[in-house]
Amino acid sequence: QALLLKNPTGIKIPSERTVYRVMDEIGLVHRPKRKPNGITKADREARKSDDLLKREFKADKPLEKCVTDITEIKAKDGKLYVSAIFDCFDSSVLGLAMETNMKATLCEHTLDNAYLAHPDLRGAIVHSDRGRQYTSETYRQALSKYGIIQSMNSDGGRCHDNARCESMWARMKSELLYDRYNTESLTTDELRVLILEIFHQLLEQQEDLLCQRWASSYD
């Protein structure tokens, strides 16, 4: 369409670069979507778990299917790594942990916090990518301790196998963080406090929504 505006009689399009150049010439803004680029790295020698979700992220009830992942946020004095577990039923945040490193204990603490807040998580499926944090013995032992079933991306580690979690992080970082704050002007400690406040607000919104659903069921 941009090329037709430039030349109504039509032209041959040799490449996407031509489209972007013409869009720039006529003042149309082009913002390509970022391609998923996972920060976790797989341990090729580690034992992998099966993909139990197979991209079916819909859940019929709470604490049935969950997804987890790590995201990184740049700060003034380094990077903060944030790990969370989301419920596929309503996208609620079940557990959260933050560290300045990506060791397996980060994911273990996420499980600890999720189970502490939701003991009924026992028996749930928690899906992740094949990063070494999730194939570590530390993480597997935590899953076993809480009776949680592990699921992982299919062979090849395609990002779409954990698309629900990827989209949750992308939305949170874009709408609630980067559009409002310059994270690189904050220290990791200040950023940690800010993220806790953001997730606290999300939890309050989720509780309000649950109350509305409960009330409407009795109307």
What is the meaning of each model-derived region?
Residues 74, 78, 96-119, 135:
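Active-site beta-loop-alpha junctions of metal-dependent nucleic acid enzymes
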Residues 39-42, 128-130, 136-139, 152-174, ...:
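RNase H-like two-metal-ion nuclease catalytic core shared by retroviral integrases
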